Amino acid sequence: MKNENMRKHRLRKPHNTPDPKLDYLLIGVVILVAALLRLWKLGQVPFMHDEFSALLRTRFDNFHDFIQQGIMPDSHPIGVEAFLWFWVRVFGWSEFWVKLPFALMGIGSVYLVYLIGKQWFNRKVGLFSAAFFAVSQFTVFYSQLARPYSAGLFFVLLMAWFWYRVVFGTKTTTKDYVGFALSAWACSLMQYFSIAQAGLIFLTGLLFLPKERRKAYWLSGIGAVVLFAPTLPIFYQQLFVSGSIGGWLSAPKPSFLTDFLQYTMNYDTLFIFAVGIIILLPVILGRRSKRSTPLRWAGIAWFVIIFAIAFIYSLTREPILQRSTLIFSYPFVIIVAFSLFKNRTLSPWQNALVVAVILFVGCASLIMTRRHYDLMYHQGFDQIAVEIQKDKEEFGDQIQFATHTEIGDAAEFYQAKTDIENRIVFNRYSNLGEFNEWLYDHKETPMLGFGWTDYVHPIWEVTAVGNYPYLIEQKDWFTSRYLTLSKTPTENSRYVLHTLDDKPYPYAKGQEWGRASVFSCDSLPDDVEALGIVAHIHNETEISNCMVVIEIRDAESDSLLFWHSTLPEDGHFVAGDNAIANAIIFDNGLSPKGKKAKTYLWNQGKKPLVLNKISYYFTRKDPVLTGLYEPLN
């Protein structure tokens, strides 16, 4: 019996012996997949809002103005902005060349995840972690953006790799300490949460550092701080003078963390299940690693601390927590999650099967479930320009075009490449009164192509529809929409306003209030996103401060739940026929069910006019509008 057991042991042992050559082949495949996913038609990925925010700062002629007027008012360290300032002077504003360095650092980050997993635990952990990182939309998305996240992630991982060599390595060299210092310095130039992550890594090292290495370790840290010192005025200006690094965000929901984890697994049930089973496989097989190591706790602590700081700050001061905030600490959670694998838990070919499953299911979910190569490669700035060109070719001089966007130059970047002249771009500083004036000046044009990006307030869309109520076509992209509209019925068009009252009602001189219209919000579809009201009026003389009011009331008690009016300065209209609009957004804090809407004209200027008709318009939630971050179904 003893001999038989020994024989079985000898037969089983080589079966699970690691095969370094196969491991090298597998990591090569992982890197190849990561490269394909990030570099695939990279030049066709249009610039996004955040990228334009950075690129437009590079237009300063000299570096001094770039720092004073471009960097100081921003909320990011100088690193990526300064790199782009030099980079675009060599390669221009080509999407491929601007994005390429960040895609390459994203690929490099996948390899660094492998190295750290192997360094901290073993090759299996590195392979599986890198495979997951290669196919997660979270990392693919940020690798295709010319923003600090891919670069910051790369340098955080590089610092962590040097950190292990300095703190736990059997032999350390001067190169290790220099690499540790330089990578820590690079982290400080990328993003404020990469600075926080670098600080956490450094402080953690103090808990485990051998006594004889403390001097060199502190010198490395001091060296990184000295290198960072020239940018301290920028750091001070952005954090303590400007006083905001994220106030434009909304407060995080209680479900933020679970939503984030699903996002990193591509919101795909099969991918989540496959990764979950693989992580638990050592437990299921009874071959999990029982080795006690502080690195598991360190990896988890880094993520938890960063998340807790951002979450608490977002609730108590101003919102700063977003998905990108966690990109610098998340890799360590993934490495720890796969750390139950021992070197001999699986055979080499079983390792290959696990890697293949992660890559195949991850790629399938990225491409099909998340539609990444559709949504990422077709976005508002470029696609609105495409639709404008198509509509111009089809309708000629019968159509005019208007676009609203946060950054006017971003829309202009793509629209300037068309041959369209009868178009206008409104930006964040434009007011609705300007749009009304432009519409009136061009009222003889029978059609309108109207686009918006960056989730502009729906009152702009309602105003466009109020003047051109027949919808020919609507197209949505990530945070963007384009409508082809007409004043009169055309082939394949539909009237999108819902009449509430079309009996003319005159307002005499000095009259401020008039008739109200009420309707049940239960008549709206379940997926309604915004409600708009359009009042069509006729005024013989110029009027001002004429607004539409929307009240949302409880259907049973009639208690007022929400009140909204347009701005008085937007209520200026020249003599003639005009459309006055207002809009509200339904969200978790204001749902339409069990409510009624009351709407009326507030003639604050008390000029005579006639209210000819009042109608409502609604928009529906389209998952595509948030599809790069949220589930598509």
Spans of features found by a protein language model:
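Membrane-proximal helix-loop-helix interfaces that form the catalytic/acceptor-binding platform
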Residues: D19-N492
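Membrane-interfacial, low-structure loops and terminal tails that flank and connect transmembrane helices
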Residues: K2-P20
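Intrinsically disordered, low-complexity regions of eukaryotic proteins
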Residues: M6, K21, L25, F52-S53, ...
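Extracellular and organelle-lumenal recognition/adhesion modules and their flexible linkers in secreted
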Residues: V45, L497-N633
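Intrinsic-disorder/low-complexity peptide segments enriched for small residues
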Residues: E4, H9, F338, L483, ...
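N-terminal compositionally biased, intrinsically disordered segments and leader/signal-like regions
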Residues: P18, T174-K175, D419, E542, ...
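Residue-level marker of intrinsically disordered, low-complexity segments enriched
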Residues: E4, F193, N422-R423, W460, ...
